[in-house]
Amino acid sequence: MGFQDPAEPFSVSDYVALAGKVIEDIHARGKNVLLVGGTGLYARSLLKAVPFTENSRDDEIRGNLEAEFAADGIEPLYARLKALDPEGAEGIHPNNTRRVIRALEYCMVTGEPFSKQAKDSKAVKSPYDGKMLVLSFRDRETLYGRINLRVEQMFADGLLKEAEDYFKRYGTPGQTSVQAIGYKELFPYFEGQYSLDEAKENIKRETRRYAKRQLTWFRREEDAVWLFADDFDAPADLISAAEDIARAHFED
């Protein structure tokens, strides 16, 4: 987005801090704020005021965990997380290396389970009065078809060149930005491990899997309002319904 070097780490706590400043600025100008995106962790952390312990990071511990992952894979680390924090491990996909390592780091540095953050957030009053709208499809095959079309559009819009430019400049570091679906599946293609068609199919598959996880995540949001695109005859009707909900919320 032009404000962060993609080779530098960028955490959810960084996002919450930056987003909070932008929201304050928009409110100061007498405007309403719309947050648009699909990452449940980031949305919840901002809107629900999830607390972040300042002293929960340790570069040496994180480095050791990353070295263990490089040597032995994710399975031993995930097993350790399940032993330290079964509840927290249940909410993290075992293939999400970054979050597994972060959760372990938190447990080891603070001596508390990573899942305690979410529980603590319930005792903290959020500074925002937000209304969450979730857009999906009732028919799963329709959703998957739209995901496949979206991936094709990403390539038409220049994803391949964007990822290749990054690869040539930085290689394949493990920062958050390049762990995003669409980047990480292309790096093996650049290294000659498989074809472009295989890379594209991997992106589609991983996006479908991610969509399933996000549906599960947002179903846990008790105050979320769901809008299903296949309930409407035309996109304009869907947009009108969303506008009505937003307008009613801002007028309250």
PLM feature spans:
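Phosphate/pyrophosphate-binding catalytic cores of soluble transferases and nucleic-acid-acting enzymes
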Residues: 1-252
